[in-house]
Design a protein with these regions (language model features):
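Crotonase-fold acyl-CoA enzyme core
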Residues: 92-208, 222, 232-240, 244-248, ...
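Glycine- (often His-adjacent) and acidic-residue-rich active-site loop
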Residues: 53-93, 109, 222
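Hydrophobic alpha-helical membrane-association signature
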Residues: 29-32, 83-86, 189, 230
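Short, charged, surface-exposed hinge/linker loops at domain edges
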Residues: 215-221
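Conserved CoA-thioester-binding segment of acyl-CoA-metabolizing enzymes
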Residues: 1-54, 92
Length: 261
C-alpha cells in the first residue's frame, strides 16, 4: 500500500507510505490520499486529522518518474487537468474540512509536498526536517495552493525568497519564519504530535471548524465583513452542546468534556 490510515481515538492519521521514493506523489498515492481525506472529512467520529510520511521524508512532491515517458517524447503533462483532478481537491480538503488538520513533518518537505503541509492548519516538525519550494528548479511556478498559503504564513518577501532562490530551509529557520508551529527532536516528534492530535480531537470540533472558516474567509475581507461573519458563526456556535458544556465546566471548575456536537 502506498498510503496507510489508522484511527487513534477520534483522530485519524494518514501516512504517505512510499519511503523508498521519499513519499513522492504518483497517481495511486494522490487518489488514495484524496479518498482518505474525503472519508475523514465526512465522518463525524473523526475530529482531527494528521498527515505524515513514512521513513525519512514527509513528501518530496510530484513523482517525476511517473511523467518521464512524456517528457522524453518532448511532451509536458496536461498541468491544468492534473491540478484540477488531484492537487486542488486534496488541498481544499486539507484547508477547508471543518475540523483541524495537522502536518506532522518528519523529514524533507519539498515541492508539492511542502504545498500539502502549507494547506494544513498546523505544522509540527522534527528538528531534522528540511523544507524547499522546489518548483523553480524545474522551470515551474509553485502550485497546489502554495502561492496562497506561503506568503500568508511567512510574509511576501520571505515567500519570494523561498520561491525564487529555492534554498533549503532547516527546522530552526522554518520556526523563525513562521512556517512551522512547533519543532521537537526527531525522537520526540511522534509522541508530542500524538498528544497534540488527541487534544485537538477532544476539543469543540464545530467551533474549530467555524474558526478555520472565519480565519480563511477574513484574510480577504474588511473589518465590517469580518465582524458580520464572526457574529453569524458565534450565533451558530452558541447553540451547540459543546458551548453549554464549556460554560458549565468553567462554572463547576472542571475540565470540559467536548463531544464535537
Amino acid at each position: 500500500m502506498s498510503l496507510s490510515v489508522r484511527r487513534d481515538g477520534a483522530a485519524t492519521w494518514i501516512t504517505l507510505d512510499r519511503p523508498d521514493a521519499l513519499n513522492a506523489l504518483d497517481g495511486p498515492v494522490k487518489e488514495a490520499l484524496a479518498g482518505a481525506l474525503g472519508e475523514a472529512a465526512g465522518d463525524p467520529a473523526v475530529r482531527a486529522v494528521a498527515l505524515t510520511g513514512a521513513g525519512r521524508a514527509f513528501c518530496v512532491g510530484q513523482d517525476l518518474r511517473e511523467l518521464e515517458g512524456g517528457y522524453r517524447e518532448g511532451r509536458a503533462p496536461d498541468f491544468a487537468a492534473e491540478l484540477e483532478r488531484h492537487y486542488e481537491p486534496i488541498c481544499r480538503l486539507l484547508a477547508e474540512m471543518p475540523k483541524p488538520t495537522v502536518a506532522v513533518v518528519n523529514g524533507v518537505a519539498a515541492g508539492a509536498g511542502l504545498s500539502l503541509a502549507l494547506a494544513c492548519d498546523l505544522r509540527l516538525a522534527s528538528s531534522t526536517s528540511r523544507w524547499r519550494l522546489a518548483f523553480s528548479g524545474i522551470g515551474l511556478v509553485p502550485d497546489a495552493g502554495s502561492t496562497w498559503h506561503l506568503p500568508r504564513l511567512v510574509g511576501l518577501s520571505r515567500a519570494m525568497e523561498m520561491a525564487l532562490l529555492g534554498d533549503w530551509v532547516d527546522a530552526d529557520q522554518a520556526l523563525a519564519f513562521g512556517l512551522v508551529n512547533r519543532v521537537w527532536p526527531a525522537e520526540d516528534l511522534q509522541r508530542e504530535a500524538e498528544a497534540a492530535l488527541a487534544a485537538l480531537a477532544a476539543g469543540p470540533t464545530l467551533a474549530f471548524g467555524r474558526t478555520k472558516a472565519l480565519f480563511r474567509d477574513h484574510l480577504g475581507t474588511d473589518l465590517t465583513g469580518a465582524l458580520a461573519g464572526e457574529a453569524e458563526a458565534q450565533v451558530a456556535s452558541g447553540q451547540t452542546k459543546d458551548h453549554l458544556e464549556g460554560v458549565t465546566a468553567f462554572l463547576e471548575k472542571r475540565l470540559p468534556n467536548f463531544q464535537g456536537a
